[in-house]
Amino acid sequence: GRGPVHINIPFATHHGVDFSVENLPVVRKITLNQLPLTMEFWKEKAQELSGKKIMIIWGQSVYPLVDVEKGADEFIRKSDAIVLTDNISNCHCCNSIFNTTTVLAIMKPTEMESLKPDYIITVGGNYIFNNEIKRWLKGMQCKHWHVGREGEVCDPFRCLSEIYEMPENHFFEQLAKIMETSSNINYSKQWKVISESPGIPEMGYCELFAITTLLKQLPINSDLQLANSQTIRMSQFV
C-alpha cells in the first residue's frame, strides 16, 4: 500500500507482432482496504460473512499475539470459524487445529468436498502445511481475504479478492462487534472430529522418538530454536 513502486517489464522484439488484440482479458480484481473505514463498510462485510463456512489460516509472526487472539476469539465464536495452524505459529485461539498436516492427509474425498470453505482469511506468515493446503485450495471457487499491517499481495490459492492493510486485532474486533452468532455450528465440529482421530504411534528409537522425548521435557516458557526443513516438521507432530 506504500510507494514508490518500480516495475520492470521485459519486452521481446516487436518485429512480427501485428497488435491485433482488441480487448484485454477479464481478470480477477483484488481490492485493497485501508484505514479509516466506515461502520457501514464493516456492517456490509459482517453481513457478507453471515452463515458462511469460514477458514482462518494462521501463520507465524503475528504480533502482538495476545491482542490479536483476544479479538479473533470473539469473531471465531460468533462465526463458528475454524483455525488451521501449527505449533510453530504459537496460536492459542479457540477452534484451532494444530495437526493440520495430518488432518489434510487423512481427509476423505467426501470430507474435502463438504468442508470446502466459502471464505479463507489468512493472517501471519509461513506455516508448515503450506504445500498440503495449497494443493487442496488452489483454484477453488471461494473468496480469500488477507489481513496484515503490510498490505502485501499474497495469492497462494489463486482466489485472493481483498487485502486488509491494518492490525489483525482491529479487523477481528470490528467484525465481532457487529456479527450475530452463527446458527451453523457444525463446521468447526466436523474439523475437530477429524483432528482428534489420529495420534502418534508407539515407535522404537529414531529421530522422531528423540525429538518427542526432548520436547516433552522442556520447561514451561522455554525459547526453542529449530533448524529448517525436517526438524520443524517432526517437532510439529509432538
Positions of PLM-derived features:
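A short, well-structured juxtamembrane/interface segment
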Residues: 35-48, 66-69, 202-217, 231
